[in-house]
């Protein structure tokens, strides 16, 4: 990575990095706009600014560029000036997740822009690199590399990480059942010919929930 100041940025908080491979060849660029500010859209996301493309006849090559946007708390001002921006573990997960999308976009070797990087990838498959990256924020070695106490500099204690993992995994089977509900409903819905109308759609969803869900769903619930 090479932090570059000589590029256009839409705010002073934005950082731009050029990305090189092991042969020191430039392969892309990555914008980071990580901190909340007035008027900025909420949430966190990664978007491709331009995709990798190469014209075989002329040899013209366009390198991928993407940007990651988040709304982390900026470094404090006033009496606390000089202190760093602090992230919760959930925010670290967000950082790793969106960074995974960025790597997916930047590390592509596909030369057709419409299907390079995150372009043209099914919505379920496009989440694979990002969710894979989240695992490093739960791994002891990964946490030891990136965590520091703001005052003492100590890494996150192993006991605290184990407590966080226990909380994460508590009733995690319920999350799996929820995903099974989505998957079965999707498969059954798209197998219907002709397409069901709204009452039939709700009846189909209720039948899936009756097979999969442990907790009953309120009768007034509307899937959205």
Label every PLM stretch briefly.
Residues 1-224:
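Cation-handling catalytic/transport regions enriched in His/Asp/Glu
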